């Protein structure tokens, strides 16, 4: 059974929505419009609203991007062919995979306890992997297996519990709509009843856990929560959820990535009481010297910083597919952040003013999407990011929510 407290939180959020917001929502999506009143867009930024008509497939990867990938792989061109071969050799592409759904997924801090957490994340990644395999090969066995996995979970899952529930929900909830978008809009074998049930799962099990964000957590949490919320909103074609999540995302990014134009020190998370330099320094893991590209989690470790960087690029990519280009708004933060972390990941000496002269590296396979957007499409030189990205190719998966991005985004002009 779902936990009563979670439904109480969701019910409270629903009652908080203004009548205007409810009447503005499409009738078919009124129950989700539901999340809460939208956060204001960052001061001075242009208003960006959900598209009147959603583009499908349109979560992280678009049809033109998928067509480009298929052409490159079939031409045995590199680095795409090596990336494809890597994906197809992984356990996620197996046609004998058996999904392991459960009604309640319980995830504690640092995976203690881990009751279905790995199973859920990896089944969601497998569904996405298989959807890519389907599109590239046009072998219906891969689409059928992806559908089996998605149907297995939508028939069973009811709740996420324990302290890591929001992050777990965000990670799996980022992968599911990528898979579902590709299968729903490029394959004819997924029944309308199954599609409806899957959408209900995303709406009723996933969204309540993530849509309201998490103000005082480390930034990667809320960024991933908004990535999942935006992907889900595209699949559901829910403009109100899209707007809500995008506003919260745009407000969070400046509290995660600093640039000197922000002022003497970074912004605190929107809605928080973190606003003095001392409070910000404490929230930024004790760092008190701020330079272009520094992240709120740099001095924690590069792994969690990478989660946030990846979520930022994923959201920007999805919204671009939906007709809004966030990259001009994000480009300075993202290019400086990718460059700074790539530089030290590559081995440059760490100055004493940065995290006390000690960094915990491990950025992960998270640079391809942002690098492709800024360098390939926008022509911005990114020497260190390019070196690290090319050195790490083919980028695999972090087994959480990032997968196969050399395949999907390396030098992809679309």
What are these regions (language model features)?
Residues 1-38:
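Secretory targeting and sorting signals
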Residues 29, 216-217, 303:
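Short acidic, glycine/proline-enriched loop segments that cap or flank alpha-helices
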Residues 41-217, 223, 227, 247-253, ...:
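Extracellular glycan-targeting catalytic surfaces
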Residues 135-138, 233-237:
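Hydrophobic/aromatic side-chain positions at a characteristic register within alpha-helices
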Residues 228-232:
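Amphipathic alpha-helical interface segments
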Residues 240-244, 302-313, 317-321:
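Active-site-proximal binding-pocket segments
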Residues 257-298:
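Flexible internal linker/loop segments at domain or repeat junctions
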């Amino acid at each position: 059974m779902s936990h009563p407290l979670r439904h109480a939180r969701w019910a409270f959020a629903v009652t908080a929505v203004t009548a205007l917001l409810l009447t503005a929502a499409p009738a078919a999506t009124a129950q989700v419009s539901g999340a809460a009143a939208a956060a204001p867009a960052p001061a001075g930024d242009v208003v960006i609203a959900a598209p009147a008509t959603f583009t499908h497939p349109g979560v992280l990867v678009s049809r033109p991007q998928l067509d480009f990938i298929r052409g490159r792989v079939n031409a045995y061109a590199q680095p795409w062919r090596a990336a494809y071969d890597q994906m197809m050799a992984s356990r996620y592409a197996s046609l004998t995979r058996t999904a392991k759904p459960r009604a309640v997924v319980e995830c504690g801090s640092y995976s203690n306890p881990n009751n279905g957490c790995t199973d859920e994340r990896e089944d969601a990644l497998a569904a996405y992997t298989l959807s890519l395999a389907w599109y590239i090969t046009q072998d219906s066995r891969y689409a059928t297996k992806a559908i089996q996995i998605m149907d297995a979970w939508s028939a069973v899952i009811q709740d996420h519990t324990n302290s890591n529930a929001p992050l777990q929900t965000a990670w799996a909830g980022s992968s599911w709509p990528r898979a579902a978008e590709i299968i729903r809009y490029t394959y004819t074998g997924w029944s309308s009843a199954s599609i409806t049930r899957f959408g209900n799962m995303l709406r009723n099990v996933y969204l309540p856990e993530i849509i309201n964000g998490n103000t005082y957590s480390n930034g990667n949490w809320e960024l991933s929560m908004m990535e999942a919320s935006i992907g889900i909103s595209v699949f559901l074609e829910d403009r109100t959820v899209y707007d809500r999540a995008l506003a919260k995302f745009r407000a969070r990014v400046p509290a995660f990535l600093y640039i000197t134009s922000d002022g003497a020190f970074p912004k605190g998370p929107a809605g928080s009481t973190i606003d003095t330099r001392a409070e910000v320094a404490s929230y930024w893991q004790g760092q008190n010297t701020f330079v272009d590209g520094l992240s709120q989690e740099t001095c924690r470790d590069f792994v969690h910083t990478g989660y946030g960087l990846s979520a930022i690029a994923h959201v920007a990519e999805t919204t671009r597919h939906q007709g809004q280009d966030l990259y001009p708004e994000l480009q300075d933060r993202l290019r400086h952040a990718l460059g700074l972390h790539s530089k030290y990941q590559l081995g440059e000496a760490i100055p004493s003013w940065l995290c006390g002269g000690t960094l915990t590296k491990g950025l992960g396979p998270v640079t391809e999407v942002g690098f492709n957007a800024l360098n390939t499409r926008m022509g911005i030189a990114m020497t260190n990011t390019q070196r690290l990205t090319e050195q790490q190719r083919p980028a695999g998966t972090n087994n959480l929510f990032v997968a196969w991005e050399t395949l999907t985004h390396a030098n992809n002009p679309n």
